[in-house]
Amino acid sequence: MVTMEELREMDCSVLKRLMNRDENGGGGSAGGNGSGSHGALGLLSGGKCLLLDCRPFLAHSAGYIRGSVNVRCNTIVRRRAKGSVSLEQILPAEEEVRARLRSGLYSAVIVYDERSPRAESLREDSTVSLVVQALRRNAERTDICLLKGGYERFSSEYPEFCSKTKALAAIPPPVPPSTNESLDLGCSSCGTPLHDQGGPVEILPFLYLGSAYHAARRDMLDALGITALLNVSSDCPNHFEGHYQYKCIPVEDNHKADISSWFMEAIEYIDAVKDCRGRVLVHCQAGISRSATICLAYLMMKKRVRLEEAFEFVKQRRSIISPNFSFMGQLLQFESQVLTTSCAAEAASPSGPLRERGKATPTPTSQFVFSFPVSVGVHAAPSNLPYLHSPITTSPSC
């Protein structure tokens, strides 16, 4: 068990004052009263603190305390760790955070879960306990505090300091094109297809998923702050090349297509847009199969989550996603590569040459080598269906 001597506690009101101080650029002590809170505040007043969200990825994505970093401690990590995790395992994509922890540059780390009221209530095998143990071994000079009541209490008392996933604002219906416009926006006299209704959906603050119709609506793109588009098709036009950055991945939506050979290139493109503080719309024709596959691969790679978890996360935002069976097979292979090689990859350099599309690399030259089968046994699709339904999809209507 994590004892009181090993883990200090912090009241939600203290964290709120600390966040106020940081937002106001303030130095000096924020003051504080109450058992345990005053001592924790004294620890944090002299430098920057780190917030670690110890909840699952889906919970963190639905809502989190602003500025927090989500740790990775899923079932795969726990099974491999056998009760002892490293910073590379719980913070695989946060190289700078790991370096700052090891250098003692954080005055304190505040960990929180969903609702743990006290340190003594933590289970020995809980994520918080495993994270605290990793911090004790790798960041000995850093003090650690548990946020009392966790995210549930803090978000209830101070929602203004939390970020939550919210529905996109309603986007006005399309304006009929003028006689000088030749864009085919995909509308018919019988109404807008299901996959074109509404607007693009936010997967992450910098990553959106939609259809070719959405990519042809400049009003939608501007309203969302889109700066770049990733066109996952061989036939969808790039309508506004003078206004947005474009990248094309010419993949067909059929069981012979090798979309996995594009995963790393797509992930690097999305990251490049994010690093420039931009936003990217990933689209194909319908925003159902090819572009959804790219978004799933991105989540699996960057968030180190399993396909099932990534699929649920994306489907909550765009219910009609349905990668074809071959793409699902390639994603499962990708999951295996990401999760089974992550221990070695987490300690390796994030850069390295990509394997040539369509060719296997016999000798590893980078942290990941993807050599996926491009033919997965499937039954022929009925001629009236434009895509194959995912085996995870519960019904064709989804």
UniProtKB/Swiss-Prot annotation:
What modifications follow translation?
Answer: Phosphorylation in the C-terminus by ERK1/2 inhibits proteasomal degradation and stabilizes the protein.
Biological process (GO), any one: dephosphorylation
Q: Name one GO molecular function term.
A: protein tyrosine/threonine phosphatase activity
**Taking every annotated instance into account, which residue ranges of this chain make up the domain Rhodanese?**
45-163
Q: Which Pfam families match?
A: DSPc (PF00782), Rhodanese (PF00581)
Q: Which UniProt keywords apply?
A: Acetylation, Hydrolase, Nucleus, Phosphoprotein, Protein phosphatase
* Positions bearing Phosphoserine: 390, 395
Residue ranges of domain Tyrosine-protein phosphatase in the record: 199-340
Output the PANTHER family linked to this UniProt entry: DUAL SPECIFICITY PROTEIN PHOSPHATASE (PTHR10159), DUAL SPECIFICITY PROTEIN PHOSPHATASE 4 (PTHR10159:SF111)
* Function description: Regulates mitogenic signal transduction by dephosphorylating both Thr and Tyr residues on MAP kinases ERK1 and ERK2.
Identification of the protein by name: Dual specificity protein phosphatase 4
Species per Swiss-Prot/TrEMBL record = Mus musculus
